[in-house]
Amino acid sequence: MSHTTVADRINELRSLIRRYDYHYYVLDDPIVSDAEYDALMTELRALEAAHPELITPDSPTQRVSGTPASQFAKVQHPQPMLSLGNAFTKADLLAWRDRVLRLLGPDAIVAYVVEPKIDGLAVALTYRDGRLVQGATRGDGEVGEDVTANLRTIGSIPLTLQATSTPQDDDLPTTLPTTIEVRGEVYMRTADFETLNDRLAAAGEKIFANPRNAAAGSLRQKDPTITAARPLRFFAYGVGVVEGISLSSQWQTLRYLRALGFPVNQDVRRFTDFAEVLAYCEAWMAKRDDLPYEADGVVIKIDDFAQQRELGVVGRDPRWAIAFKFPAREAITRLLDITVNVGRTGVVTPNAELEPVQIGGVTVRNASLHNADYIAQRDIRIGDYVIVKRAGDVIPYVVGPVIARRDGSERPWQFPTHCPACGSPLEREEGEAAWRCNNFSICPAQLVRRVEHFVSRSALDIVGMGERQAELFVQRGLIRDVADIFFLKADQLAELEGFGPKRIANLLAAIDAARQRPLDRLLVGLGIRYVGTVAAQTLVAALGSLDAIMAARQEELEQIPGIGPVVAASIVDFFSRPANRALIEKLRAAGVQMGGVSGPTRQSDTLAGKTFVLTGTLPSLSREQASALIVAHGGKVTDSVSKKTSYVVAGANAGSKLAKALQLGIPVIDEAGLLALIGTTAEPPPSPPPPPPETNTDGNQLLLPLDGE
């Protein structure tokens, strides 16, 4: 690449980055993904490193970024609010450590303070003589915006400070500083964000794309009363200017901030062994979905302030800190088309067809659009650049459009009025978001999905039958209802491509074995609305046979523990339909078992009266095994978290259920906690207060003695 070409590319990169900075920092409306932005910045740094004569003072690599909006008064930060360099791999982290050790010298003893990197809005809070006098956003790192009135409305930000200490904190100052600038992150918990969006949607107002945008948009309101109504929170992570006291390390600073009354992330740790730092990063990357807030990485800082000063700052990045970035969970790509799928209950769901995009190491080509209201509220159009999110085991979904990238070619999309599979008019019940095809008996798309569900592992578990086989058998007219599965013949299957003698024999044997599945599995397979594994086992345990369940009145069903009015009404409605009763008789004629339950026999009443919700992946128990274990010891398992929930059992990649439990103050336990409850009638506190700092044999402090929030 010629010198002129390099200069042109550098100017192009700077222009792009400035534009993206403006949208991200000033408008709070990012138009590219973090991964795209990081790639541009990495390229610019590499080109400038190779051609230092082209570096200019106004390059994005030489200053922080952004320009404050004009609607708030500007605030000059007494010390720059620096950004952090990024590490994406273990090799990047080791390279950073090696640079630090090389600069500090071979005899340096280094400790590291690490914590999850919250995806919120950075602010600086200035206190004089213990009183909050000013609060400002980060802005461009040099100049921010005065949002004092709005920050005062956040309950977790103290308006006055009071120094306290305990014997274990004998290294902390016992007096208040004359001036202290506390830096931290304003954020919104995931559950609070979802509740806020629901409220805004119900009022017909614009909703937010993600918790960070919600926090930023809420904090930058001209009317503080609007901010006060938003569920904002604050975590302190450091200080700027400090006068009147002396602080010597990041670890001491965090404990002092906690003593002053600031919430500090309880997951902060201090290590002297860098291997522990690497393990911490790997652990949080694996369980990032366990957090009740959005986190996009881990921040690592050199603990000792004297070492920080010795290491200094290069351009916009301090040498003494780095951010380990998690793989992206969001990306921006183009929405090529919107199609619809018809489910087994007739619900018609819109689906986004996307330009393929990598998210967290997976190529995403399709994503959920949830329902018609979701599309309308976000004004999602075909041809839009859209934000796509993939988190944990959640199906990828479209967050919303990037309005700033529209060029006028985008087309609004209209939800169909008729079923794409059978042509029946779509209907929507009052109070529901879903449109349905109610042509239950004839719609081929619904039949395919019902067959898939009927043969699934949680139902009749027919090995060798799945989506492709269901579509083929329905298309060929071999299956007109799920009972027809049991009347398939070898000569019919032999006419189908790919079905040889061995495959036919295996499939027919699997179908024959399915006749003997317990009744609760058949109930699940029938697809009765609201009747899942636990409800089916409860029904069979209480009533014993399918005939008894079919004959039960709604009032009788409601008397069964765990079967409420909604579930009871759904069961009565299902069995009142002549087509469904005819299906049952056809299954009976096919020799399908109509009694028995697959759940465990009652072993004890240890968990009697307690209600559990399961979320995430447990270390050794499957979801079904954990549910069966709870039921066997007298407990009840439900699908949703409420104030009536006794415990939430959380494993890896727990999602919104965990967040809601934390919001409601529901006790959260892991698999070991569940087993402990079953083994004893005592109820150990699921979230004990943190003990004083412990030290392992390497001298690593394992737990910051902070309660957080």
Curated annotation (Swiss-Prot):
List UniProt keywords, sorted A-Z. Answer: DNA damage, DNA repair, DNA replication, Ligase, Magnesium, Manganese, Metal-binding, NAD, Zinc
Please identify the protein, giving its name as recorded. DNA ligase
Record's Gene Ontology CC terms?
cytosol
List, in alphabetical order, the Gene Ontology terms for molecular function in this entry.
Answer: DNA binding; DNA ligase (NAD+) activity; metal ion binding
Q: Which Pfam families match?
A: BRCT (PF00533), DNA_ligase_aden (PF01653), DNA_ligase_OB (PF03120), DNA_ligase_ZBD (PF03119), HHH_2 (PF12826), HHH_5 (PF14520), Nlig-Ia (PF22745)
Question: Domain BRCT spans what residues?
Answer: 602-691
Region entry Disordered, spans: 679-709
Question: Is ATP-binding given among the entry's keywords?
Answer: no
